[in-house]
């Protein structure tokens, strides 16, 4: 039993932001129906593959963010499929899409039309620049992807080394953070509907989300009138809070609190530093020289020895790669790696598990991602429009 096992979601999204949002809901038990355009989600054929892309139904990208969903292929441009979709809407709690503003209206399936079929429907969109219903801007006709959102929202300007160019954050935070916020908005709307009976429109823009993610830069600029820029792995108001090279790799140390600083100086056998720089202000004012002192120390010690010296008393960690993560007992104890079947392959694929843990209704990936149109017969039967015939045969 999942916390959301009474929630029916129609997911018209594709690529990353929308599918990740509905994946979070599916992991918590929601019945997520992936309504796919003819030919399916654009990323079904994206690599990597376990062995042979010609044999496998989809790649790891699609598998990772579409696990636990059901699939129905519909062409909303045809009367038959549009009517089938509207029948599904009548039985749904939530509709999610991530098309450019106005796309659903072209099929006469916009929010206002769907509300006529289901007055308490929660309709949610993820767009680069939001929907005119919640605030019209000149950008809303423009396309957007993660890279665009990171560039506009200030993420790239504050990421990278101080003497280097603006740099994209590795994970697609323009998509992923927006997706998480949109899921929060959907659940808030569900709660509101339970109290009032009112459905509503939930709108989350990628650009807006990146500004929210960079909240620190907003108040900094408001206070001093200077645009924050790149500082490598350091922090503008905390020290030491940085990465350092050890004898066998890199570590990060976050010893900005006075007690942590004293413990770090003790491990370095430098009580003079603790005495000379006892407070945050003095450490920040002398951060460059102090960073050199710490870097000279870490360079002579391997990561494991360094962390043993700090004995869990100072926040510190090695910089791990993905192979290290796969070997970390913590990750296995927390069930953060999940093996699922990969249709067309002889072995399973590992995907990231759910980071949301609950004592009574533990979220969990609900099995592999669906084949295109795999659940057509059962979904059309549930919608009361006939069983239909699967356009793509299931491998089950």
From Swiss-Prot:
Reactions catalysed, as given in the entry: mesaconate + succinyl-CoA = 2-methylfumaryl-CoA + succinate
Uppermost EC category: transferase
Means of activity regulation: Shows highest activity at 4 M KCl. Does not require divalent ions for activity.
Alphabetical list of Pfam families matching this protein: CoA_transf_3
Keyword set includes Transferase: yes
Molecular function (Gene Ontology), one example: CoA-transferase activity
InterPro entries reported in the protein's UniProt record: CoA-transferase_III_domain (IPR050483), CoA-Trfase_fam_III (IPR003673), CoA-Trfase_III_dom3_sf (IPR044855), CoA-Trfase_III_dom_1_sf (IPR023606), Scnl_mescCoAtase (IPR054905)
Keywords: Transferase
Active site: 175
EC number(s) from the headed UniProt entry: 2.8.3.26
Membrane-spanning segments: none
Sequence similarity: Belongs to the CoA-transferase III family.
NCBIfam families reported in the protein's UniProt record: Scnl_mescCoAtase
Subunit: Homodimer.
Job of this protein: Involved in the methylaspartate cycle. Catalyzes the transfer of the CoA moiety from succinyl-CoA to mesaconate to generate mesaconyl-CoA (2-methylfumaryl-CoA) and succinate. Also shows high activity with methylsuccinate as CoA-acceptor, and only low activity with glutarate, acrylate and itaconate. Cannot use other CoA donors like acetyl-CoA, propionyl-CoA, butyryl-CoA or acetoacetyl-CoA.
Protein name: Succinyl-CoA:mesaconate CoA-transferase
Species annotation: Haloarcula hispanica (strain ATCC 33960 / DSM 4426 / JCM 8911 / NBRC 102182 / NCIMB 2187 / VKM B-1755)
């Amino acid at each position: 039993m999942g916390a959301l096992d009474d929630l029916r979601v129609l997911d018209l999204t594709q690529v990353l932001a929308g599918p990740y949002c509905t994946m979070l809901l599916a992991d918590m038990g929601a019945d997520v129906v992936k309504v796919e355009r003819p030919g399916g989600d654009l990323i079904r054929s994206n690599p990597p593959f376990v062995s042979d892309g010609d044999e496998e139904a989809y790649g790891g990208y699609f598998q990772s963010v579409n696990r636990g969903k059901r699939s129905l292929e519909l062409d909303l441009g045809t009367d038959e499929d549009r009517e089938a979709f509207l029948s599904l809407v009548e039985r749904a709690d939530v509709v999610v899409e991530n098309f450019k503003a106005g796309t659903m209206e072209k099929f006469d399936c916009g929010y206002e039309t769907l509300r006529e079929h289901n007055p308490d429907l929660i309709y949610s969109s993820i767009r680069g620049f939001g929907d005119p219903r919640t605030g019209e801007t000149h950008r809303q006709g423009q396309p957007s992807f993660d890279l665009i959102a990171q560039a506009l929202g200030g993420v790239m300007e504050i990421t990278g080394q101080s003497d280097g160019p603006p740099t994209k954050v590795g994970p697609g935070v323009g998509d992923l953070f927006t997706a998480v916020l949109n899921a929060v908005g959907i659940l808030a709307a569900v709660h509101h509907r339970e109290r009032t009976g009112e459905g509503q429109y939930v709108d989350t823009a990628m650009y807006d989300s990146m500004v929210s993610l960079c909240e620190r830069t907003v108040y900094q600029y408001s206070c001093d009138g200077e645009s924050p820029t790149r500082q490598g792995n350091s922090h503008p108001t905390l020290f030491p809070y940085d990465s350092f090279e050890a004898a066998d790799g890199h570590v990060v140390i976050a010893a900005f609190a006075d007690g942590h600083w004293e413990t770090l100086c003790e491990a370095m056998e430098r009580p003079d530093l603790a005495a000379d720089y006892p407070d945050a202000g003095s450490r920040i004012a002398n951060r460059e020289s102090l960073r050199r002192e710490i870097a000279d120390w870490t360079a002579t010690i391997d990561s494991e020895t360094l962390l043993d010296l700090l004995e869990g008393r100072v926040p510190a960690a090695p910089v791990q790669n993905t192979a290290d993560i796969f070997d970390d007992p913590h990750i296995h104890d927390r069930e953060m790696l999940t093996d699922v079947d990969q249709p067309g392959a002889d072995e399973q694929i590992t995907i990231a598990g759910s980071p949301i843990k609950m004592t009574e209704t533990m979220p969990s990936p609900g099995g592999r991602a669906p084949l295109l149109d795999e659940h057509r017969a059962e979904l059309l039967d549930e919608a009361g429009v006939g069983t239909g015939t699967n356009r793509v045969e299931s491998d089950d």
